[in-house]
Structures are given as structure tokens and as C-alpha cells.
Amino acid sequence: MTDNNNGEIVEDKDNEKLKGEDNINNHISNHNNTEETSFEDPELEEMKKRFREMEEEAKKLTELQNNLESNITGNNGVGIGGNIGGGGGLMNTDQEEIDSRSVYVGNVDYKSTHDQILAYFQSCGTVNRITILSDKTTGHPKGCCYVEFVNKESIINAMALNDSFFNERQLKITPKRTNLPYYMRQGVLPPGRGGFRGGRGRGGIRGGIRGGRGRGNFYQPY
């Protein structure tokens, strides 16, 4: 359309004005969307990252628990056949029966090797497994180990080596005791079950609970 007074094209100007306004609105809308996206995405990514970290941590804890349940130490247990101490290395017998023919050896020199310990205890009887305890964080030896014999009779001979010197350190040897749940180590049982409170004399769990009045004391060398 043409203006008769000045000869300008009014319709074209109106169309250009509308197009300009649309472009401005689109620019503002795109800008707002960009701001929203840039504001939301980092937060969403951070949440996803934390969730993945939590999943990894839960997986590691599950693996650690499974290892502890399948093997007493989870590391450095070596059988005479050369098997490293994992769940498959243990014989398919009751854990308490295995412990009944094993001894705990404390104050062991940190540099002592499996072969040295084996040679030291071979005179007591046939050794089935030696488990050197290590720190789960550093992997360094704790200065103690378990020696498992084939026969229970070997325990008597091994106990005779208590206070003997091995690699210039005086060994402390005691019969190995089966690991007890936490609440049993504290001398109490969950509600509804009998506790370890007793009168005088020695308690009834393999001589491990000494009486007295009130709460019994549960001795564990390891």
C-alpha cells in the first residue's frame, strides 16, 4: 500500500516492524532457554555424579563384606598347596572345626615370610595353611598370623613354642578361637536372649568368659 501524501510504502514498513519484533522475541526466548539450560544442567550432572559415586561405594562395601565372610582375613592366607587365601582356598568343613586345629601367633616379625613360619612350625605337625594378617588399608603385615594344622594334636606341640624366639622376637601363641558376632564380644546378647551375666566361676563358651559378679569379661588375643 502507498501513502498518497509522501509516497512511502506503509504496508511494507508494517511487515518489517512485525518481523523485527518477532526476531527480538525469539532472541529473548532463546536467551532465556539458554540461561535455564546452563543453570539446570550442571546441577543435574552433579546429582548424577554423586549417584554414581554412591553406587560405586556401595559396590565396594558389598565386595569387602563378601571377602570377609568367605575368608577370615581376605589377604595373605597361603595354603601348603600354594593357594592364595580366598573363599575357595578354605576346606569345605565347619569353621569352628578348622579353628579347633589352628593357633594364633602374635608378636611376629613384620619381615617374616610364609616359608620361614612354615619351617618353624613344621616340627609341631603337618601344617595345612598359614595366614599372615595384613592391614586392609596399607597392605602391611600386622605382626601376627594363624597356623592351621591337619590334626588337632599338633596344637599341643605348637603351644609348647609359646614365648619362644623367632627372628629375634618372642612369640605369643594361643589356640585360635572362632570369631564371634560383635554383641557376643561385648558380653551381652540381643533382647529376649540370655546374656553372659553370671555368678562366680568360668563362663561356658570355651573358657573365654571369666565370671566375677556382673558382666563377664571376654578375652580375645586377636
Curated annotation (Swiss-Prot):
Its main subcellular localisation, reduced to a broad class, is: nucleus
Which Pfam families would you find in this protein's record? RRM_1
Q: Quick one: where's region Disordered?
A: 1-43
Gene3D superfamilies linked? 3.30.70.330
* PROSITE patterns linked to this entry: RRM
- Entry annotated with the keyword Chaperone: no
Name the cystine pairs. none
What is its subcellular localisation? Nucleus
Recorded GO MF terms: poly(A) binding; RNA binding
Keyword field: mRNA processing, Nucleus, RNA-binding
In terms of superkingdom, the source organism counts as Eukaryota
RRM domain location is 101-178
Give the GO biological process terms: mRNA 3'-end processing
Which residues fall in a compositionally biased region of kind Basic and acidic residues?
A: 10-24
Q: Does the keyword GTP-binding apply?
A: no
A GO term from the CC aspect: nucleus
Functionally, this protein is described as follows: Involved in the 3'-end formation of mRNA precursors (pre-mRNA) by the addition of a poly(A) tail of 200-250 nt to the upstream cleavage product.
Q: What is this protein called?
A: Polyadenylate-binding protein 2
Species of origin reads Dictyostelium discoideum (Social amoeba)
Q: Tell me the name of the encoding gene.
A: pabpn1
